[in-house]
């Protein structure tokens, strides 16, 4: 492992993004996934926490919009990186970014780990 961080944020932080009708830093796929659930704010808050954690690890020049949290049924969530974010990952000497998400009633959190590329 190269680096790790955890981001925690209030779920209420996401509500204004949904009310305004904007997409914020979320991809169409992230919005569609969340809106298909009974608790879209919680789902999006966990994704926003993951994006912020990844940006923190990948450094300047990478934005929340450069990170997409992916979800395949039956598998752990993943991160899809833009070309800019992928370049930052490689510059850090990492081969992958791993993510874990959680949410409760009031807060959501994500842990992101940068792991070395296989030798």
In which residue ranges do the predicted regions lie?
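Core catalytic alpha/beta fold that binds nucleotide/phospho-ligands
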Residues: 1-119
């Amino acid at each position: 492992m190269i680096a790790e961080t955890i981001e925690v944020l209030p779920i209420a932080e996401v509500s204004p993004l949904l009310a305004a009708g904007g997409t914020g830093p979320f991809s169409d796929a992230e919005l569609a996934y969340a809106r298909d659930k009974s608790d879209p704010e919680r789902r999006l808050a966990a994704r926003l926490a993951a994006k912020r954690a990844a940006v923190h690890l990948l450094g300047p020049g990478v934005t929340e919009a450069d990170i997409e949290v992916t979800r395949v049924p039956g598998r752990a969530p993943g991160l899809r990186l833009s070309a800019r974010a992928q370049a930052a990952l490689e510059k850090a000497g990492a081969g992958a970014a791993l993510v874990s998400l959680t949410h409760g009633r009031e807060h959501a959190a994500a842990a992101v780990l940068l792991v070395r590329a296989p030798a």
